[in-house]
Amino acid sequence: MTMKIRAIVTVKGLVQGVAFRHHTVLQGNQLRVTGWVKNLPNGDVQGCFEGDETDVQALVEWCHHGPSRARVDRVIVERKSFRGEFDTFDVRY
């Protein structure tokens, strides 16, 4: 049985204005991960990802490079207990 996890992910660098959130949603849906992603006022992007550990980890790994126009300088991951509170993966504003 695969363990389910939650990860709070903060991505730093040139990650706003480059479709990072849109592509994160596409990747999340492809991986069957649920949660959200949003822009932060300081220029970072933050997400909450839930799902099978291998799928969440794959999305976190994708965040280390993001879409082609992004420049990722750092990814901070806080691993949390799975809550199962999301049915979809979407952009929050």
Curated annotation (Swiss-Prot):
It comes from the Bacteria. The keyword Transmembrane helix does not apply. The active site is at 21, 39. One of its GO terms (molecular function) is acylphosphatase activity. Residues 6-93 form the Acylphosphatase-like domain. Its EC number is 3.6.1.7. Pfam families: Acylphosphatase. InterPro entries: Acylphosphatase, Acylphosphatase-like_dom, Acylphosphatase-like_dom_sf, Acylphosphatase_CS. It is an enzyme of class 3 (hydrolase). It catalyses: an acyl phosphate + H2O = a carboxylate + phosphate + H(+). Keywords: Hydrolase. NCBIfam families: PRK14438.1 (NF011011). Belongs to the acylphosphatase family. This is Acylphosphatase. It comes from Geobacter metallireducens (strain ATCC 53774 / DSM 7210 / GS-15).
